[in-house]
């Protein structure tokens, strides 16, 4: 059986993180990356309801907000065959995770975009959310990736630093280029949307423009 580690990117949603931990702790080891330097993530040593100890969790409290790219950088610290990358506003079912594993793809997600070659802006791209499809790139949320595939693009991930937006776009295109494939896959499955609050990256009015700027670099073959 392949081994899996969950990487949760956390920013000001501690209740969501605890809900994800309770769903998966004991099934997979978990790393929580906390990008809120003003409030460390802490988990009780024992869940008061179940009496279960949290034994397989690493908590990384960053002293700076290293944004989303840090979740990919941290993957290289762990030996598991697969990394399941989760945002802190979504909880996939275990059945969905198993489905993603059984597909045995280099990288697979639940959310993707297509139509890059015809689009002139990010909002013109076609959405694929929790459906079985071939897409141009994957979008955050829930992504399962093979560690040996990430190893192929390790230098690019490390050298890019911590860009404000588009880590998922970068990784998607780097993997496509490394493996010489044209599309990536999204899958259907059951998920639970958790409260977003007022801290989502898409609250920034420049969010979609910044993501489109990343797409355009690949569209114009400058990266």
Predicted regions and their residues:
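Hydrophobic targeting segments
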Residues: 2-8, 29-33
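Short, well-formed alpha-helical segments that are part of the catalytic scaffolds
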Residues: 8-26
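A short, glycine-/small-residue-rich helix N-cap motif at loop->alpha-helix starts
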Residues: 62-70, 164-165
């Amino acid at each position: 059986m392949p081994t899996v580690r969950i990487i949760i990117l956390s920013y000001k949603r501690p209740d969501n993180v605890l809900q994800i931990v309770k769903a998966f702790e004991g099934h997979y080891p978990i790393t929580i990356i906390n990008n809120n330097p003003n409030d460390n993530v802490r988990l009780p040593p024992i869940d008061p309801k179940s009496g279960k100890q949290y034994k397989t969790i690493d908590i990384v409290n960053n002293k700076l907000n290293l944004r989303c790219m840090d979740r990919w950088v941290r993957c290289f610290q762990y030996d598991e065959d697969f990394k399941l990358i989760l945002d802190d506003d979504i909880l996939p079912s275990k059945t969905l995770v198993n489905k993603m594993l059984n597909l045995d793809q280099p990288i697979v997600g639940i959310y993707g975009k297509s139509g890059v070659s015809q689009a002139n802006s990010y909002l013109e791209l076609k959405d694929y959310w929790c459906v079985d499809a071939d897409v141009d790139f994957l979008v955050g949320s829930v992504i399962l990736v093979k560690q040996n595939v990430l190893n192929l693009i390790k230098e690019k991930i490390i050298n890019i630093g911590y860009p404000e937006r588009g880590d998922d776009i970068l990784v998607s295109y780097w993997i496509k280029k490394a493996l010489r494939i044209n599309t990536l896959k999204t899958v259907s499955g059951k998920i639970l949307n958790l409260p977003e609050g007022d801290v989502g990256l898409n609250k920034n009015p420049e969010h979609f423009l910044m993501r489109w700027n990343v797409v355009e670099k690949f569209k114009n073959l400058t990266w």
